[in-house]
């Protein structure tokens, strides 16, 4: 069965360069081994990266042993739901690609919070009914 995103559709890839995902498959797939719930497809910003560094989650420094290249603003990366929510509460949330965010993220983060930072939906959906 295909993995689902927070909108109920099939989970779409998050990022191939750098190759993201807990399983390094380009998707924010999750399973029992993924204790951190790396389920949110984020488009990282400098503010988000600095926030993560301040809370002890350095996403800038490369760690080749984990196939982690280090991130720069604009990269798409599967981040943990808990750390994204903390950044959201602290006013430093990264942008979110809803179609690439695993439904398991909803166990931790309300859909409304993700939608506030979504970059894959038009700002005004009124014209979509036409």
Per-range role (PLM):
Residues 84-107:
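Short, compositionally biased
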Residues 1-47, 120:
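Extended boundary segments
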């Amino acid at each position: 069965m295909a993995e689902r995103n927070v909108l109920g559709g099939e989970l779409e890839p998050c990022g191939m360069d750098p190759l993201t995902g807990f399983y390094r498959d380009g998707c924010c797939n999750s399973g029992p081994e993924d204790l951190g719930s790396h389920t949110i497809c984020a488009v990282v910003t400098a503010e988000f990266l600095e926030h993560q560094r301040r809370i002890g989650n350095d996403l800038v420094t490369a760690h080749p042993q984990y196939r982690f290249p280090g991130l720069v603003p604009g990269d798409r990366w599967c981040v943990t739901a808990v750390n994204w929510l903390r950044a959201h509460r602290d006013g430093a949330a990264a942008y979110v690609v809803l179609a690439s965010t695993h439904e398991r993220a909803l166990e931790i983060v309300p859909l409304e919070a993700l939608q506030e930072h979504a970059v894959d939906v038009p700002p005004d959906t009124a014209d979509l009914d036409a």
